[in-house]
Amino acid sequence: MSELAAVLTRSMQASAGDLMVLDRETSLWCRHPWPEVHGLAESVCGWLLDHDRPAAVGLVGEPTVELVAAIQGAWLAGAAVSILPGPVRGANDQRWADATLTRFLGIGVRTVLSQGSYLARLRSVDTAGVTIGDLSTAAHTNRSATPVASEGPAVLQGTAGSTGAPRTAILSPGAVLSNLRGLNQRVGTDAATDVGCSWLPLYHDMGLAFVLSAALAGAPLWLAPTTAFTASPFRWLSWLSDSGATMTAAPNFAYNLIGKYARRVSEVDLGALRVTLNGGEPVDCDGLTRFAEAMAPFGFDAGAVLPSYGLAESTCAVTVPVPGIGLLADRVIDGSGAHKHAVLGNPIPGMEVRISCGDQAAGNASREIGEIEIRGASMMAGYLGQQPIDPDDWFATGDLGYLGAGGLVVCGRAKEVISIAGRNIFPTEVELVAAQVRGVREGAVVALGTGDRSTRPGLVVAAEFRGPDEANARAELIQRVASECGIVPSDVVFVSPGSLPRTSSGKLRRLAVRRSLEMAD
């Protein structure tokens, strides 16, 4: 078996900790000792070896103990894992199932394991060449098998596709193991004292890495379905309190949401938290500060805030601050005034970061900004269907930023920079300001340039809005952006909540927004 599978086997079998899984139907937590989880993984391995030993296994479903076990089960069988999301609310079941199996086939996955209603939907599709197995059956066969040696990939991880077509990153067992070890080393994970709590989806690199890092450390982990969080976000705080969690992770919008509506919080104890990772999307310094201050009466330590940087191409984490420092905000001064950017820490062990100042650089008066390039032991072997990358080469991320005294600062995406009248404007700065307008949905704002083909380059802001007075809201948005960003939007487009297209991980699909606006014109 791979070193990744071997190390996880030793850690899970020797662990005295538990995997606690929330049953959404009953709202009860089910306890599964890590050695038991590994026993289920061995059963999944046996099932896979009895079914033609696939090179890759697709997983779809809620984050049950069986699904978590199936990840290690696939690795014991020498197979790669690809995890795809279930249907979103309002989706057509047949179309979702057909699209899911088509995606699996497109990346070479011909064995899929699922359970419950997901399984029934997938089996309703007549797709030749795909074996669809019952995950519950596979995990409870009590069939162990000799692990298989394999030099193939461990994970076929989809990239977000927020600024273009999604691709599939090929992650080797060594890359995954290096990233998990680097993350645990940076935050100092200790199985004897730490408890993790997560609602992040396992098909997303941050959610998968959080679960696997706990398994690697043998630390207790409380795992809830993402749908349970989205149905009632403030339950997250109750889970943290009930579990005595010391570690959690979420994208920026979750912290903003809790901080904004903190008056709804009562009777929780967050005093044990020492690591609250913030990643997956741009960090709002003001929103994160508001969260920390609002949670302080409940025992939260602001030093636990860890805004971080990562991407699927590097397995997950690239830079993470040391716990205890808290949010560091770097002020950048340009022609429109001062802007705050979160400092995202230094590279985890095994990774390197540099800034390439070429044609994509967006200079300003106080910092030299260039494209962020990375390399290291956590890097992907390449994109599926493309040439492999040289492990010694620097990988251009497409993100713009700079290196400050406290570590990496990310300013935005290179292809998203808006150039108007000789100025380079980062959309996230405009979006954070626009989201302060009453009625504008936080995390549902997109700032775009009108493009080179326009006779008059300008700034367009599209936002999901709910309120009685669009005219006043539009005027306030224009005034705020003009005052704080030094640019007057040429147009503001309000759409109904939920209208802006998103990726499966919840990121706004900027190119799709641009296309829809162009079609409307």
UniProtKB/Swiss-Prot annotation:
EC number: 6.2.1.20, 6.2.1.47
GO molecular function per UniProt: adenylyltransferase activity; ATP binding; long-chain fatty acid [acyl-carrier-protein] ligase activity
Keyword terms: ATP-binding, Ligase, Nucleotide-binding
InterPro entries assigned to the protein according to its UniProt record, in alphabetical order: AMP-bd_C_sf (IPR045851), AMP-binding_CS (IPR020845), AMP-dep_synth/lig_dom (IPR000873), ANL_N_sf (IPR042099)
Top-rank EC class of the record's enzyme: ligase
Keyword flag Translocase: no
Function: Activates lipidic moieties required for mycobactin biosynthesis. Converts medium- to long-chain aliphatic fatty acids into acyl adenylate, which is further transferred on to the phosphopantetheine arm of the carrier protein MbtL.
Similarity-based family: Belongs to the ATP-dependent AMP-binding enzyme family.
Designated name of the protein: Medium/long-chain-fatty-acid--[acyl-carrier-protein] ligase MbtM
Source species of the chain: Mycobacterium tuberculosis (strain CDC 1551 / Oshkosh)
